[in-house]
Amino acid sequence: MARTPVSPPATSAPAERAAWLRAELERANYAYYVLDQPDLPDAEYDRLFKELESIETEHPDLIVPDSPTQRVGGEAASGFEPVVHEQPMLSLNNGFADEDIVAFDKRVGDALGKNASEPPVPVEYAAELKFDGLAISLRYVDGVFVQASTRGDGTTGENVTENVRTIRSIPLRLKGKRVPHVLDVRGEVLMFKRDFERLNERQRAAEQKEFANPRNAAAGSLRQLDSKITAQRPLSFFSYGIGVLEGMDMPATHSELLDWYKELGLPVNGERAVVHGAEGLLGFFHAVGEKREKLPYDIDGVVYKVNRRDEQEALGFVSRAPRFALAHKFPAQEALTRLVAIDVQVGRTGAVTPVARLEPVFVGGATVTNATLHNEDEVRRKDIRIGDTVIVRRAGDVIPEVVSALLDRRPDDAREFVMPTHCPVCGSNIERLPDEAIARCTGGLFCPAQRKQALWHFAQRRALDIDGLGEKIIDQLVEQNLVRTPADLFNLGFATLAELDRFAEKSAQNLLDSLEKAKHTTLARFIYALGIRHVGESTAKDLAKHFGSLDPIMDASVEALLEVNDVGPVVAESIHQFFAEEHNRTVIEQLRAPGRVTWPEGPPAPKAPQGVLAGKTVVLTGTLPSLAREEAKEMLEAAGAKVAGSVSKKTDYVVAGAEAGSKLAKAEELGIPVLDEDGMRKLLEGQL
């Protein structure tokens, strides 16, 4: 259980303020290290830590042995055996601004006497990435992996040997000839971005709680009491330091240590360099910053270490960190602010997204006033309310997002978000289909927010095939308010088109000719051109074939639409909602007005003959021995069956041939009868 936050003292007396800061930092440490549920952004923690350091510097008598400034935070969680580190796993001091790095380099140079020479001799550093994961120590005895432990409080950690044994990148036996008697390898367990996304996909599919970020996923996976669960989690590891070493001499430099680790078969990250002086340090930092977002894993800074081991020993340690190393952190990617309102915005595909309006906050190198909340379910899951103090995250060019709300700071007048029922842009109904997280505006042909997307889709080759109507022309037509709906395209004249930027007279005439040609189409193409969600070319053809003309489709109930080949509940509901929106019907009437778009009408398809498979749904998958897919389909339909393209609970039979794939697996999962070609023939003959 998380420890209850304590309110800040009413007085500003140093003793009381320091006591509160220690309590708040210890509470945050417990949440971060023990519960794996961090509730304070790094930037806020750093700010409080620096304030406590400042008070203790000014008032040394207030320093107590268990102050967070005197040790690394965290305690061993129950359920794991404690492990005492022979060589403490210390944390690093932090630098944030370029000036901090210049000052660090000067301190090191002064202490080593390099600045006293003329000219000064630049210090040699090993520069590497600061991973956003979980620090661990691996012990090898005579080259065999025997133990893994977390950092814990720096002196005592947790025994996670069985869990770490499941991480494939960690060797269980070291390679090469230079293997020591005892070696403690220090490094970081982390989860790559792609693996994190796949893990959350599995969590969603299993209807289990998703992880907030790769670090939480890595920490939670490593500290599972059941190592079988850890084995299913895609964890990775990078080596970057050393603890105990027995049986051979310590490498002379840090860079040589990492080279030796590679010889032993230990994972070592390639994004590292040996640099000289403050200029070299800052050059490495800014180079990494430029490619940070493209890296396949999360980092929150870089680490500088004096490269030579003898110089490291000369510099020594302070109580909680080495003097020879520094973590240079990127601008905070998370910060606290107040959520003052939640609006919704409509995207070009009609997606209606809640957007948080925030009190301005500087995060990720920019001032942020808006952040995405993704969808209504996310707002509910995170329990985010108007008036909350929230954690906002901004990473590089990624759209800022609200990570969570601080429930202990929730005001009494905080209000829940209510998704509007009508589009704020056009007034059309907002609908959310079953099993979909995104709500959408149903005014696809009318809504200004969706205008460009609707026009682009309408002109596609597989739709009305309006040659010459590309994205740049559509942009101009919309931005100059010349076209509001697809119907307005047929009002365009030569003079209007010829005035468009970079649109010659010949291009204008070609587009007019193409628009004239587009007036003569087919019902299937017209249906597809409307841009109804979930209605592709195949479904458009099935609708045209089944109903024969447009009016019956526009007036069809969901039940009537479900009778169409390959139309399931989600697609049927989407079609029904589209035609139920009056704005869409108005545009359609404008499109098929006299002199506009026409197509040959046809009779509705005859009802399927009553046969041995009347009312049954069959799915074909794989390659049958003697029948082509189309032949088998015709035989089944002739017997009254509906041949569907996907397996669902409504499927009655699956006919599987060679190389049957996911459809066969789904059928077996749902317990649906599976037949081969002979079984299908017997079914058609009424023998099954």
Curated annotation (Swiss-Prot):
PROSITE patterns: BRCT (PS50172), DNA_LIGASE_N1 (PS01055), DNA_LIGASE_N2 (PS01056). It comes from the Bacteria. The keyword Ligase applies. The active site is at residue 130. Belongs to the NAD-dependent DNA ligase family. LigA subfamily. One of its GO terms (cellular component) is cytosol. NAD(+) binds at residues 42-46, 91-92, 128, 151, 188, 305, 329. DNA ligase that catalyzes the formation of phosphodiester linkages between 5'-phosphoryl and 3'-hydroxyl groups in double-stranded DNA using NAD as a coenzyme and as the energy source for the reaction. It is essential for DNA replication and repair of damaged DNA. The lineage of its organism: Bacteria, Pseudomonadati, Pseudomonadota, Betaproteobacteria, Burkholderiales. Residues 608-688 form the BRCT domain. GO terms for biological process: DNA repair; DNA replication. Its EC number is 6.5.1.2. InterPro entries: BRCT_dom, BRCT_dom_sf, DisA/LigA_HHH, DNA_ligase, DNA_ligase_AS, DNA_ligase_CS, DNAligase_adenylation, DNAligase_N. This is DNA ligase. Its cofactor is Mg(2+); Mn(2+). GO terms for molecular function: DNA binding; DNA ligase (NAD+) activity; metal ion binding. It is an enzyme of class 6 (ligase). It catalyses: NAD(+) + (deoxyribonucleotide)n-3'-hydroxyl + 5'-phospho-(deoxyribonucleotide)m = (deoxyribonucleotide)n+m + AMP + beta-nicotinamide D-nucleotide. Keywords: DNA damage, DNA repair, DNA replication, Ligase, Magnesium, Manganese, Metal-binding, NAD, Zinc. Zn(2+) binds at residues 423, 426, 441, 447. Gene3D superfamilies: 5' to 3' exonuclease, C-terminal subdomain (1.10.150.20), 6.20.10.30, BRCT domain (3.40.50.10190), DNA ligase/mRNA capping enzyme (3.30.470.30), Helix hairpin bin (1.10.287.610), Nucleic acid-binding proteins (2.40.50.140).
